[in-house]
Design a protein with these regions (language model features):
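Short beta-strand/loop motifs in extracellular/secreted proteins, especially
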Residues: 17, 27-31, 73
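Low-complexity, intrinsically disordered short peptide segments enriched in small/polar/basic residues
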Residues: 1-3, 29, 88-90
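N-terminal edge beta-strand
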Residues: 1-19
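Extracellular/periplasmic metallocenter environments
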Residues: 48-94
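Right-handed parallel beta-helix/beta-solenoid
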Residues: 1-6, 45, 51, 55-56
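Short, surface-exposed beta-strand/strand-loop-strand elements in extracellular ectodomains
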Residues: 29-42
């Protein structure tokens, strides 16, 4: 299972791929959310609001298991608080 840092920018994945969100911030939970009306690229949650919470780092980074949907395309999402690398983020599913 691949690790994806919540504040990283663009990344690639394979349809249906399992991965783990990783949050290195020791002060804030990370919130992954839908970018406007763009399609949601993850299998959970299955209904709005499309948000995921990755816990903050305590003794080790916060993590959350996740999975990409089965439709190849370029998708956009927002992760906060990750202002230094900007939003929206991009995942390309092949």
């Amino acid at each position: 299972m691949a690790n994806v840092k919540v504040c990283d920018g663009n990344w690639n994945g394979v349809k249906g791929q399992n991965f783990t969100w990783v949050n290195d911030d020791d002060e804030n939970d990370a919130i992954i959310s839908q970018a406007g009306s763009n399609p949601w690229p993850f299998t959970t949650p299955t209904s709005k609001p499309y948000t995921l919470t990755v816990p903050m780092k305590t003794t080790s980074p916060g993590t959350l298991d996740c999975q990409l949907i089965d439709q190849p395309d370029t998708y956009y999402y927002v992760s906060n608080p990750c202002d230094t690398l900007g939003n929206p983020k991009t995942v390309i599913i092949t």
